[in-house]
């Protein structure tokens, strides 16, 4: 199992290659990354047979920025038109017993077509794996991840459930709320799922908390905050959705989001303003560094080139700034499924 397969947003294969190559070099695990443009996946081929397993053991998936999902295996294998299950059982003879099964596809138009096949194929495959003793429900065991590039080509991979994506392919199944004024609302909801353990939501996303939404109009992110019954200052020169204003929980301030400062410390600051990432990074530095908020979710809009390098530079500058202030800050940064040419950062100021 010398190959690490990583899913990603189409068009960001280069960022995944740069990110995993940097980590592998730091960990002294030799190998090379390969991908095709807009293929929505990257393979990192290790020189050592156990290289992919060592990478997954040494890295925390949650700390990777651009990969949506990962799995280790020997590479893609071909399947016949018939007797696919028999071929897979033969391939899995050398694998450990697995505790769960996910059938995955790539986030491409071809992948969407393959998903129909996967839905039909999963039930008989699961039954065959259980009967053969290759699958039993136990989250302490590795997860079997089958990534189908077509009905005839599959990557037979493994990953630890607690060190891989929260959802198949890293894609959450979130329902767009009809009352929300824009689809951007799903970005903030996904960020909460990604960065905040579900059992902590009632404490960290509690009613009557104070929140500021910078660049709020028309109110997609504000809707999520109001839905949690927070008191929100919506900062934007543009108009807010009327249903949000009728809630009685929103104070609309028509000022520049980058100039606004709250009169008192707030629990949450969220920001989805289209601006150069360096300027947004400086905004994060001010709000967290000066104690204007306890937690923040902020989107960094990325340039067309050197996107991974730009994100790394901003995160490094933030860490250095907070260290110089003597602050303890928890970081998270991920390109979420609902993100486009951007990444989402979560920061939480901790008490020393």
From Swiss-Prot:
Keywords in alphabetical order: Cytoplasm, Methyltransferase, rRNA processing, S-adenosyl-L-methionine, Transferase
Active site: 301
GO annotation (BP), single: rRNA processing
One Gene Ontology cellular component annotation held by this UniProt entry: cytoplasm
Subcellular location: Cytoplasm
EC number: 2.1.1.186
Superkingdom classification of source: Bacteria
Molecular function, one GO term: S-adenosylmethionine-dependent methyltransferase activity
Function: Catalyzes the 2'-O-methylation at nucleotide C2498 in 23S rRNA.
Subunit structure, interactors included: Monomer.
Protein name (record): Ribosomal RNA large subunit methyltransferase M
Gene: rlmM
């Amino acid at each position: 199992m010398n190959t690490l397969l990583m899913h990603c947003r189409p068009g960001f294969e280069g960022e995944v290659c740069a990110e995993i190559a940097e980590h592998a070099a730091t960990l002294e695990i030799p190998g090379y990354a390969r991908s095709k443009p807009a293929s929505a996946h990257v393979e990192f081929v290790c020189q050592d047979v156990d290289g992919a397993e060592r990478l997954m053991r040494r890295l925390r998936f949650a700390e990777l920025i651009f990969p949506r999902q990962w799995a280790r295996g020997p590479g893609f294998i071909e399947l016949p038109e018939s007797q696919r299950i028999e071929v897979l059982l033969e391939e899995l003879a050398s694998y450990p017993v697995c505790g769960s099964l996910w059938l995955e596809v790539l986030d491409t138009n071809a992948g969407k077509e393959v998903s129909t096949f996967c839905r039909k194929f999963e039930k008989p495959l699961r039954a065959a794996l259980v009967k053969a003793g290759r699958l039993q429900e136990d989250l302490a065991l590795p997860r079997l991840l089958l990534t189908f590039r077509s009905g005839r080509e599959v990557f037979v991979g493994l990953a630890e459930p607690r060190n891989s994506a929260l959802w198949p392919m890293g894609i959450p199944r979130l329902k767009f709320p009809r009352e929300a004024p824009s689809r951007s609302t799903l970005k903030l909801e996904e960020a909460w799922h990604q960065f905040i353990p579900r059992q902590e939501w009632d404490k960290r996303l509690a009613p009557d908390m104070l929140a500021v939404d910078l660049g709020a109009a028309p109110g997609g992110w504000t809707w999520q905050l109001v839905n949690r019954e927070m008191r929100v200052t919506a900062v934007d020169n543009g108009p807010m959705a009327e249903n949000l204003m009728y809630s009685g929980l929103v104070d609309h301030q028509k000022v520049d989001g980058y100039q606004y400062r709250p009169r008192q410390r707030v629990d949450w600051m969220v920001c989805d303003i289209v601006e150069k990432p360096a300027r947004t990074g400086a905004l994060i530095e001010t709000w967290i560094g000066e104690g204007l908020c306890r937690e923040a979710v902020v989107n960094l809009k990325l340039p067309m080139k050197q996107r991974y390098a730009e994100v790394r530079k901003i995160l490094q500058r933030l860490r250095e700034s907070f260290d110089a202030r003597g602050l303890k800050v928890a970081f998270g940064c991920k390109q979420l499924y609902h993100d486009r040419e951007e990444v989402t950062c979560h920061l939480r100021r901790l008490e020393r």
